[in-house]
């Protein structure tokens, strides 16, 4: 049974995130002791609450972040602060894919990127979870959205999410997109660049960012952590900004709660629709 501020949840759905894969390889910053159960986040129904839980009750439909592991299970105990009411506009599968991706996008574009209406946003890895969330949020904020990726067929889907333009990052196995981005932004470059990829994509990004632009470092899905020639941000007047959405909320709980509330309010407008490409039973 849950004690203190714990909440016992019957898991309805759990999502697979890139950090789950990294944890199995020992490459993620959070390194749980072996053995452990995978699963960073999910959705479900509260079964019981601890004796000091205030804002949640039995029967509530919720999303949860399990502090790194444990979501791939039938039941899970999670501290109250990691549990939020499920947006009514989302089903359980969509809700299981909601928290990490959309919170990352919100903290990146709004809190750290200071995205303004009408600005151009270059979203790398746009066909992945955090990229999809960024495309949808940027469009909700009335920005010009340029989505990038390595598969043209997958990129076409991003138009449904709000992408105004799609750009392949690779041309014959060479990362080359700077000229296309400049053409789409009247030679200026993107005002905000959202980069969960790193590597060669980062190297090319610093060549197509606008004066005063914000390059948001979200992750390194390419496998290579890049280094930047610091004369570039000096000459072009842009900022390189690191984003850790979870840590942002832990260090400033008030703003963290505001962020969580904001993404739920936007979800209820219908602007956020997590795309589920495949579902598996827990036995699989």
Task: Tell me the role of every PLM-derived stretch.
Residues 104, 129-130, 200:
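Hydrophobic/small residue at the entry helix of a nucleotide-binding pocket
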Residues 139-201, 252-258:
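Adenosine-nucleotide cofactor-binding segment
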Residues 56-57, 115, 209:
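Short, well-ordered loop/turn sites that connect or cap secondary structure elements
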Residues 61, 120, 144, 213-214, ...:
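Short glycine-centered segments of the SAM/dcSAM-binding site in methyltransferase folds
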Residues 127, 135:
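N-terminal Rossmann NAD(P)H-binding glycine-rich loop of SDR-like oxidoreductase domains
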Residues 1-16, 27-70:
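Glycine-rich beta-strand-centered segment in the early N-terminal region that forms part
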């Amino acid at each position: 049974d849950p004690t203190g501020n714990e909440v016992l949840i019957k898991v309805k759905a759990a999502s697979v995130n890139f950090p789950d894969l990294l944890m199995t390889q020992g490459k993620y910053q959070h390194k749980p002791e072996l053995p452990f159960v995978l699963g960073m986040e999910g959705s479900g129904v509260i079964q019981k609450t601890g004796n000091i839980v205030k804002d949640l009750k039995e029967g509530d439909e919720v999303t949860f972040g399990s502090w790194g592991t444990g979501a791939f299970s039938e039941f899970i105990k999670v501290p109250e602060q990691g549990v939020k009411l499920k947006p009514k506009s989302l089903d359980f599968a969509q809700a299981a894919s909601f928290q990490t991706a959309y919170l990352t996008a919100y903290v990146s574009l709004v809190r750290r990127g200071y995205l303004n209406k009408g600005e151009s946003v270059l979203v790398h890895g746009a066909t992945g979870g955090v990229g999809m969330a960024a495309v949808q949020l940027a469009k909700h904020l009335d920005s010009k959205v340029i989505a990038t990726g390595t598969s043209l067929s997958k990129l076409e889907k991003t138009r449904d999410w709000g992408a105004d333009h799609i750009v392949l990052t690779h041309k014959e196995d060479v990362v080359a997109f700077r000229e296309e981005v400049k053409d789409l932004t009247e030679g200026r470059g993107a005002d905000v660049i959202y980069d969960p990829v790193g590597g060669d994509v980062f190297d090319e990004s610093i060549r197509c960012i606008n004066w005063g632009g914000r390059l948001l470092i979200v992750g390194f899905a390419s496998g290579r952590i890049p280094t930047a020639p610091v004369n570039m941000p000096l000459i072009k007047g842009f900022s390189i900004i690191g984003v850790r959405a979870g840590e942002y909320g832990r260090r400033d709980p008030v703003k963290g709660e505001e962020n969580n509330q904001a993404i739920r309010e936007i979800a209820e407008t219908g602007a956020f629709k997590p795309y589920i490409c495949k579902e598996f039973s827990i036995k699989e």
